[in-house]
């Protein structure tokens, strides 16, 4: 049985491939666009059966000429995840139409389809639950994800021929994101800031939040891969699910966890947030005017639906997850 993973050389896709490998599954077709060649490194430690360029894959899907038999599932992680990309034509073709074509093909062939949605569909809301009235995206990226989720809702009412699951990823961090540049996680950037400068920067006060007190639901990519595989194991489950920890933690906590993990590797003692700020190991910069009115100061996944689907594993909190990530970066990137 063959499994297809799109975006396989990317951040979440490569972690799904790795998680499948850990189960002994290697009959994997990795689909991606390697025009940014450094992404190949994410697949170099994985075992796959074949690589297919994204554009060729899309052509074969649209013409119904994919040569693979007995496809067990499609994990669709390939998308433009740059929330600052305002090219609506590109975003809608790459994130919406491509996903719609894949859905139609998977439904025709009765293949389970697990795809990446996003918490960006909620915009600046303060309640993050999988309900239409709570969804108000702020940018074309969020809209592209929102629009496809509406397609799934309609298809579910009409009746599905095979499993379809959309995961609304919250703030994901972890190994294999180094190719993402400015779109990499805050933990990634803090690690490199600290290694280069000996301190990290955080946004100052804004929107009623104090220095570094804006909060996010930070979720480890290890947990994201686990949840994807849980639904792969349960093809009877379909729907849209938030994928976060259910906890909202301050950027201050993330910065402190990153700096302290780096300090621990240097043989230095852990410091409190107050001490880190006093010693200027954490510094605050003015909140950018360009982000005012477009910035989520708070996110927290409501994971009630995920728990009701039977997923009982505990998620890493920021401290434990970031410690694991910093250890990986020190071993692989430093």
Swiss-Prot record:
Q: How is the cofactor bound?
A: Binds 1 NADP(+) per subunit.
Needed co-factor(s): NADP(+)
GO-annotated molecular function:
ADP-glyceromanno-heptose 6-epimerase activity; NADP binding
Tell me the pathway: Nucleotide-sugar biosynthesis; ADP-L-glycero-beta-D-manno-heptose biosynthesis; ADP-L-glycero-beta-D-manno-heptose from D-glycero-beta-D-manno-heptose 7-phosphate: step 4/4
GO BP annotations, alphabetical order: ADP-L-glycero-beta-D-manno-heptose biosynthetic process; carbohydrate metabolic process
Provide the residue positions that the database annotates as binding NADP(+): 11-12, 32-33, 39, 54, 77-81, 94, 145, 172, 180
Q: What does this gene product do? A: Catalyzes the interconversion between ADP-D-glycero-beta-D-manno-heptose and ADP-L-glycero-beta-D-manno-heptose via an epimerization at carbon 6 of the heptose.
Could you describe the subunit structure of this protein? Homopentamer.
Name this polypeptide is given: ADP-L-glycero-D-manno-heptose-6-epimerase
Gene behind the chain: hldD
